[in-house]
Swiss-Prot record:
Name listed for the protein in its UniProt record: Small ribosomal subunit protein uS13
Pfam families named in the record: Ribosomal_S13
Region (Disordered): 94-118
Annotated InterPro entries: Rbsml_uS13_C, Ribosomal_uS13, Ribosomal_uS13-like_H2TH, Ribosomal_uS13_bac-type, Ribosomal_uS13_CS
Listed GO CC annotations: cytosol; small ribosomal subunit
Alphabetically ordered keywords of this record: Ribonucleoprotein, Ribosomal protein, RNA-binding, rRNA-binding, tRNA-binding
Annotated GO MF terms: rRNA binding; structural constituent of ribosome; tRNA binding
Species of provenance: Salmonella typhimurium (strain LT2 / SGSC1412 / ATCC 700720)
Subunit-structure text: Part of the 30S ribosomal subunit. Forms a loose heterodimer with protein S19. Forms two bridges to the 50S subunit in the 70S ribosome.
Lineage: Bacteria, Pseudomonadati, Pseudomonadota, Gammaproteobacteria, Enterobacterales
PROSITE patterns: RIBOSOMAL_S13_1, RIBOSOMAL_S13_2
Name of encoding gene: rpsM
Family statement drawn from the similarity comment of this UniProt entry: Belongs to the universal ribosomal protein uS13 family.
A Gene Ontology BP annotation from the UniProt entry: translation
Domain of life, per lineage: Bacteria
Amino acid sequence: MARIAGINIPDQKHAVIALTSIYGVGKTRSKAILAAAGIAENVKISELSEEQIDTLRDEVAKFVVEGDLRREISMSIKRLMDLGCYRGLRHRRGLPVRGQRTKTNARTRKGPRKPIKK
């Protein structure tokens, strides 16, 4: 297994799909990385040479991925919560942030129903 950005990339998958196992790399970014590295999209990771894997590592390192991206996202949410803006309050209360209705739906964000005790 090739190790890129601290993640074991599956050998048996095509390169364009295998790179999506890295957090922050989707299909579009994966295709851009492969094009910049000069590697075909349909080649499997196990068929790549060590030099090609090194170029992939260099190309992936140009983007914010994995732990750095997770930290950046959590810090931006924390910043909103510290500011006390509307979006920050919604994050703090565990409610939908982007204007969805909450009277009937939003069960994913609110969690399971809490029964009213009589």
